Swiss-Prot record:
This is Lupus La protein. The gene is SSB. Residues 227-348 form the xRRM domain. Binds to the 3' poly(U) terminus of nascent RNA polymerase III transcripts, protecting them from exonuclease digestion and facilitating their folding and maturation. In case of Coxsackievirus B3 infection, binds to the viral internal ribosome entry site (IRES) and stimulates the IRES-mediated translation. One of its GO terms (cellular component) is cytoplasm. Residues 7-99 form the HTH La-type RNA-binding domain. It comes from Homo sapiens (Human). One of its GO terms (biological process) is positive regulation of translation.
Length: 408
C-alpha cells in the first residue's frame, strides 16, 4: 500500500515537472521569454539542466536531474528532447515555434478567456489546480494592480478555440461556492469599452448637474446679497465740479453712515453710493448736519434713494465691479510672489528666482483599464509586471516582462 502511495506521488510530481518544462518551451511562453531565447541560441537549442533548476517554480518541484529526465521521458507531448549525457534538454527541432503573424495573434485572442471571481489571496497554484479538468490551458495571466496585488481576475489561453468555447459555455461555474464571471477576452474588452462610454455619458451628466447646482447656489447667494443691500443705494447727480472725487463723499458722510462702495469716477456728473446700512437714514443724518443743504464742492446735488428694478440693476453692477476689483488685486498679488528681497525682481541672467522642473511625464494604468495585450508579447511603451503568469527564469536573471513568474 505504501509503495502504491509513493508511486502515485511520484507520478503526480512527474506530471507537474513535465507541465512546467513544456510550458517554458511551449508555443505561448518561449516567444516571450528573452532569457530562454538567449539560452537556446548558445548550443543548438540545448539548455543545461543546471540552468533549468534555477527557475523558481521548477526548483520548488525538484533539483534532481534524474527525476527531471525520467519525467520528460514519459511525456506524451513529445515536445522535449534529452541529450545523450542526460544533462541538457531542448525543444524538439521537429516541432518549431509557430510564426507570430496577425493570423496567429488573432487565433490566440479567440481562444483567450477572461475569468473573474477568485479571492484576492488565491495563488497561481490554486488557480491551476481549479483549471486542471477544464481543458488544456497554455497560459494563465493573473491580473494585478499597480501595487502587484491580485485583482481576483485572470486571462486564460486554451489550446484550441473549441476548448475555450466549451469552457465559456459551461453554465454555473464556481470557485469555492463563488459564482464566476466568464467571457471571451474580446467580449470582455467590448464590455469594458461600453462601460467606459456609459461612464463618460454619466460623468458629463453629473458635471452638467453639478454646474447647474453651482450656478443656482451662486444665483441664490447673489440674490441674498442683493436682498441684504436693498435700500442701501444712494444716487447723486448734478453739475458737479470736475475735481469732485470719492474722498469728498467719504468726508461728507463720515459721521452719518458707513460707505461700502462708491461707483463714481472723477469728472462724471453722477454716481452711486452703497452704504452698509439704509441709505435713507445716512442721507437724513447728513442733511440734518448741513441744515438740509447737502452740497459737493459748493455745487447743488440731487440725492435719490434707489428702489425697484433700477436699484437691482445698480446693485448687480456694483457686485460685478467688486468681484472684478478683487480678481485684479489677487492677480497683482501673484505677480509679486517669487521676487527677491526688497520686492525687487530677479535680474535677467542671474538665475535667481528661477525654478525649472525636468523629467518624464508618467502615465499610470488604472485598474481594469489597460489590459489590451498584443498576443506576441509586444506591449509598446508600457512595461508589464512579471507576476502575471507562471513564466519564470533563474532568479538571478529575472526579466521584467508581462508574463513573469506567478508567485516568486
Amino acid at each position: 500500500m505504501a509503495e502504491n502511495g509513493d508511486n502515485e506521488k511520484m507520478a503526480a510530481l512527474e506530471a507537474k515537472i513535465c507541465h512546467q518544462i513544456e510550458y517554458y518551451f511551449g508555443d505561448f511562453n518561449l516567444p516571450r521569454d528573452k532569457f530562454l531565447k538567449e539560452q537556446i541560441k548558445l548550443d543548438e537549442g540545448w539548455v543545461p539542466l543546471e540552468i533549468m533548476i534555477k527557475f523558481n517554480r521548477l526548483n520548488r518541484l525538484t533539483t534532481d536531474f534524474n527525476v527531471i529526465v525520467e519525467a520528460l521521458s514519459k511525456s506524451k507531448a513529445e515536445l522535449m528532447e534529452i541529450s545523450e549525457d542526460k544533462t541538457k534538454i531542448r525543444r524538439s527541432p521537429s516541432k518549431p515555434l509557430p510564426e507570430v503573424t496577425d493570423e496567429y495573434k488573432n487565433d490566440v485572442k479567440n481562444r483567450s478567456v477572461y475569468i473573474k471571481g477568485f479571492p484576492t489571496d488565491a495563488t497561481l497554484d490554486d488557480i491551476k489546480e481549479w483549471l486542471e479538468d477544464k481543458g488544456q490551458v497554455l497560459n494563465i495571466q493573473m491580473r494585478r494592480t499597480l501595487h502587484k496585488a491580485f485583482k481576483g481576475s485572470i486571462f486564460v489561453v486554451f489550446d484550441s478555440i473549441e476548448s475555450a468555447k466549451k469552457f465559456v459555455e459551461t453554465p454555473g461555474q464556481k470557485y469555492k461556492e463563488t459564482d464566476l464571471l466568464i467571457l471571451f477576452k474580446d467580449d470582455y474588452f467590448a464590455k469594458k469599452n461600453e462601460e467606459r462610454k456609459q461612464n463618460k455619458v454619466e460623468a458629463k451628466l453629473r458635471a452638467k448637474q453639478e454646474q447647474e447646482a453651482k450656478q443656482k447656489l451662486e444665483e441664490d447667494a447673489e440674490m441674498k446679497s442683493l436682498e441684504e443691500k436693498i435700500g442701501c443705494l444712494l444716487k447723486f447727480s448734478g453739475d458737479l465740479d470736475d475735481q469732485t472725487c470719492r474722498e469728498d463723499l467719504h468726508i461728507l458722510f463720515s459721521n452719518h453712515g458707513e460707505i461700502k462702495w462708491i461707483d463714481f469716477v472723477r469728472g462724471a456728473k453722477e454716481g452711486i453710493i452703497l452704504f452698509k446700512e439704509k441709505a435713507k437714514e445716512a442721507l437724513g443724518k447728513a442733511k440734518d448736519a448741513n441744515n438740509g443743504n447737502l452740497q459737493l464742492r459748493n455745487k447743488e446735488v440731487t440725492w435719490e434713494v434707489l428702489e425697484g428694478e433700477v436699484e437691482k440693476e445698480a446693485l448687480k453692477k456694483i457686485i460685478e465691479d467688486q468681484q472684478e476689483s478683487l480678481n485684479k488685486w489677487k492677480s497683482k498679488g501673484r505677480r509679486f510672489k517669487g521676487k527677491g528681497k526688497g520686492n525687487k525682481a530677479a535680474q535677467p541672467g542671474s538665475g535667481k528666482g528661477k525654478v525649472q522642473f525636468q523629467g518624464k511625464k508618467t502615465k499610470f494604468a488604472s485598474d481594469d483599464e489597460h489590459d489590451e495585450h498584443d498576443e506576441n508579447g509586444a506591449t509598446g511603451p508600457v512595461k508589464r509586471a512579471r507576476e502575471e503568469t507562471d513564466k519564470e527564469e533563474p532568479a538571478s536573471k529575472q526579466q521584467k516582462t508581462e508574463n513573469g513568474a506567478g508567485d516568486q
